[in-house]
Amino acid sequence: MLIGEYKHVVDSKGRIILPSKFREELGERFILTKGLDNCLFGYSLKEWGVLEEKLKKLPLTSKEARTFLRFFFAGACECEVDKQGRVLIPQNLREYAGIQKEVFIIGVMTRIEIWSENNWLKEMTNENLSVDRIAQKMEELGI
C-alpha cells in the first residue's frame, strides 16, 4: 500500500527522487499521467492494468467518458526509475501540474500523486479539509 507524504526537489533535468518505499511498490517502471486537481497520478504497471480494465467498460457512446479517457490516456507515459532512484517527469506533465522546483509526493493506497508545492499547500488549506467535515463524510460512508 502506498502511504505517506514526502517533499522533494526537482533537478535541472526535471527529475525527482522517488521515496524508496514508493519505488518498492511501483517497481522499476510505472505509469505517470495527468491526475485530477492539477496533480499527477502514478500507478504500478499492475495497478494500471486493473484500472485499464475498469475504464474499458465505460460506454463509448458517452461524451463524458470519451473526454475523460482522452484526458487520462493521452497524458500517460511509462517512466523508468534510474539507479539513483530518480524519475524524469516529462515537460508536458510538469506544465500540467504546475511543477517547477519543489514537489510533494504522496501515497494514496494504490497510486502516488505528485503535486507542485504551491498546489499541495492550497489543497491542504482547502475548506473541505476541516476535521469536522471529514469526520462527517466518514460517518456518511460508514467508515
From Swiss-Prot:
Residues 5-47, 76-119 form the SpoVT-AbrB domain. GO terms for cellular component: cytoplasm; nucleoid. One of its GO terms (biological process) is negative regulation of DNA-templated transcription initiation. Keywords: Cytoplasm, DNA-binding, Repeat, Transcription, Transcription regulation. It is found in: Cytoplasm, Nucleoid. SUPFAM superfamilies: AbrB/MazE/MraZ-like. Its main location: cytoplasm. InterPro entries: MraZ, MraZ_C, MraZ_dom, MraZ_N, MraZ_sf, SpoVT-AbrB_dom, SpoVT-AbrB_sf. GO terms for molecular function: DNA-binding transcription factor activity; transcription cis-regulatory region binding. It holds the Pfam family MraZ. Belongs to the MraZ family. Forms oligomers. NCBIfam families: division/cell wall cluster transcriptional repressor MraZ. This is Transcriptional regulator MraZ. The gene is mraZ.
